[in-house]
A protein has these predicted regions:
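Cytosolic ends of transmembrane helices, especially the final helix of ABC transmembrane type-1 domains
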Residues: 1-17
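Flexible, glycine-biased helix-capping/connector loops in cytosolic signal-transduction modules
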Residues: 20-23, 165
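Pre-NBD coupling/linker segments of ABC/ABC-like ATPases
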Residues: 23-34
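An intracellular "coupling" helix at the cytosolic face of ABC transporter transmembrane type-1 domains
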Residues: 3-6, 23, 47-52
């Protein structure tokens, strides 16, 4: 009886999720190509609660050329993550516009836009399966050399090669059998496999030692100079 009650509650919640309507949708005739990695914030104001008067971002005017590398710093809660979330259109601006590749992000097909804007967060998700299975979320039908190259740039090869089964080593749900730094490096490699025009690293090397962090940043500058970072 207890299991039936729990199953019924779970089924109800699943149905609610399936019936949920997306707040962010593409236009009837969306753009299906991102020309380059240029990013423009034109007088952007953003609030999580529309009409509340509580502005997370106010009148942001920022222009980043394709292939340029910039860093955004600030205290906790100042809106850094909110700012980058607008680039991949996880939220819509309250006023102003965000452009990627010279076009307003609201004009793109969502899958097209998000395939070209790779985001690596401080805490990322690894799935049950092998190391290679997790990398394939970045590129499903890639060659083994491509997976190795991405891991080399992210300095993930340093620990993968020491695993008993290498790229066939098992990853527990959530990457429970890997350290924080190892998970971050795998997620960076996975993002690189998408070959994005924009790569956003949101405190994504916080669990990596200083020397490895420097190696990753140097490799990103050398190997993918055309990607906006």
């Amino acid at each position: 009886f207890v299991m039936m009650t729990m199953s019924a509650a779970s089924g109800k919640r699943i149905a609610e999720v399936l019936e949920e309507k997306a707040d962010i949708t593409a236009p009837p005739e969306p753009l299906d190509c991102v020309e380059d990695g240029s990013i423009d914030f034109d007088h952007v104001t953003f609030s999580y609660r529309q009409g509340s008067g509580e502005e997370t971002l106010s009148d942001i005017d920022l222009h980043i050329k394709s292939g340029e590398t910039i860093g955004i710093i600030g205290g906790t809660g100042c809106g850094k993550s909110s700012l980058v979330s607008l680039i991949s259109r996880l939220y819509d601006v309250t006023s102003g516009s965000v452009k990627v590749g010279g076009e307003d992000v609201r004009g793109y097909d969502l899958e097209t836009l998000r395939n070209q804007v790779a985001v690596v967060l401080q805490k990322n998700v690894l799935f049950s399966g092998t190391v290679l299975d997790n990398l394939r979320w970045g590129r499903k039908m890639g060659h083994m050399d491509e997976y190795r190259d991405a891991c080399r740039i992210a300095c993930a090869d340093e620990f993968i090669e020491h695993l008993p089964k290498g790229y066939d080593a098992w990853v527990e749900r959530g990457g429970a059998n890997f350290s924080g730094g190892q998970k971050q490096r795998l997620c960076i490699a996975r993002a690189l496999l998408k070959q994005p025009k924009v790569l956003i690293l949101d405190d994504s090397t916080s669990a990596v030692d200083t020397a490895t962090d420097a190696k990753i940043r140097e490799a990103l500058q050398t190997v993918i100079p055309g990607t906006t970072k």
